Amino acid sequence: MTLTATQQLQINHRSVRRFLDKPLEPGQLEVLISCGQAAATSSFIQAYSVIRVTSPQKRQAIAVAAGGQIWIEKAAEFLVFCADLRRINQACEAAGKGSLEGYSEHGLAAVIDVALMGQNVMLAAESQGLGGVFIGGIRNQPEVIVEQLDLPHRVVPLFGMCLGWPDANTEVKPRMPVESILHQDRYQEMDPLRLAEYDERMSKYYASRGSNVKLSDWSNATAQAMQGKKREHILEFLRSRGFFVC
C-alpha cells in the first residue's frame, strides 16, 4: 500500500530540540492554532486555551521548572496548552445552568480535547517544514507555570510545545510493531518474544543515534521514565484547580 503525503508526514514525526534563529512567518502561528482547533472536541466544548509565551524571563523560569530544558528559551515559539474549564463554567452560568462541580468526566474530556488539539498543531507545523517537541516537564512544578502565566481557577497547564525551524535532522524513533498495538475483539498480553525483539531494536537505536547515545532498551528506558516521573503532587494540584474533585 502506498502511503499518502499526510501518512508519510505522520510516520516521519520526530522531536526537534535544536532550532534556527529564525521566526515564524507572519500569521503562521494563527494558522497552526486554527488547525489545532479543527481537531475533534467532546460535545464541542472546546475545553482548551493556549498561552503563547514571548517573555524571555517567563521562558527562562518555565525552562528551569521543567527540568532545565533550554530549548524552551531558544525556540521561535513556545506554547503552553491548558485544559480550560473556566470558559465552560462561564458558559454554564450564562445559560442559567449553575457552576461546574469538578466532575472527573469533565476534567477527562478537557484533557483529551487538549491532547487532540496539540497533536493537530504539531502535524500542521510539520507540514510546513517546522519542527517541535512536546514539553511534559511543565508538570514538574505546575504551580510555577500558574504563577508565570497568571492562570485562573479551572485552568490547568498540561504540556508545553516548542516550535521552530529545525537546525538539524534527528532520527525517527522506531515504534512498536502494529501487531503489538492493534488487538482484535479482546485485549491480548504482549508476547514476551515480541517485546524482547523490540527491546533489541531499541537498544541498537539508542546506541547508534546521532545524539544522546545511551546503553538501554525500551523496557529499561520506560521503567526509568515511569519510576522517575511519578509527580505525586499532580492529583492534589488538579483538585486545587477544580479538576477531578468528584
Predicted features by range, described:
Residues 1-246:
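Acidic, surface-exposed loops and disordered segments
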